[in-house]
Regions:
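Alpha-helical transmembrane segments in inner-membrane proteins
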Residues: 1-206
């Protein structure tokens, strides 16, 4: 829903569309963040507020087969779309005129890939909360190993991302007597690892 609002406010053409997309995303994101804050403010501090806070931290603690099946359709559909059309994502790195010469509708394809990615993200977040850094760290790691082609990066990111989450979730259950939310551990591990990747690629050199 938020993605549709961003595209609606950004428009479909004209100058500075990228800037409008970024600004629209910031505005919509800020609005929904304030709605979450309002929900926390009016929530029952004894019962509802801890559940909201724990969900925002991100964890696999409450996962079940029933919950997984409720979002599996969206996740699998999004993954299939990205895998089937991943070669077209490489074409988007070319100029718009060159992309059109391949018979690809630039705006339509971009919207389709964003919609597929958003469906996956929304389904996952609804089940286990906001677990960050995986979507930022793992694709960069895969690009270092397999190169820049999305033909290899997308499938490997899916596999390595799942393995990374399983490892961090297992560690979060074993480090202390009470389970640490997985998002805390992914941030503690992901932030320094991402800095190392930047340093290896020369991103921190002057």
């Amino acid at each position: 829903f938020s993605v549709c609002l961003v595209y609606l406010f950004a428009g479909t053409g004209g100058e500075n569309r990228t800037l409008r997309l970024v600004l629209s995303g910031m505005i919509i994101g800020s609005f929904f963040s304030s709605m979450v804050s309002f929900a926390k403010y009016v929530a029952d501090p004894q019962d509802e507020l801890p559940s909201i806070t724990y969900w925002l931290l991100g964890s696999l603690k409450n996962m079940s087969w029933t919950l997984l099946l409720s979002g599996a359709g969206w996740i699998l559909t999004g993954i299939v779309i990205l895998l089937l059309f991943r070669w077209k994502l490489d074409a988007l790195m070319l100029s718009e005129e060159e992309v059109k010469s391949f018979g690809i509708s630039v705006h339509g394809f971009r919207f389709m890939t964003v919609a597929a990615s958003s469906a996956i993200t929304a389904a996952v977040v609804s089940m286990c909360g906001q677990i960050g850094w995986i979507g930022l760290l793992i694709p960069h790691f895969c690009r270092m190993i397999y190169g820049g082609s999305n033909k290899d990066v997308i499938p490997s990111s899916i596999v390595y991302g799942a393995l990374f989450l399983l490892i961090t979730d297992t560690a979060s259950r074993c480090i202390t007597a009470s389970e640490i939310p997985a998002a805390i551990l992914t941030s503690l591990i992901g932030a320094p690892l991402f800095l190392i990747l930047l340093a290896k690629n020369g991103g921190l050199r002057g």
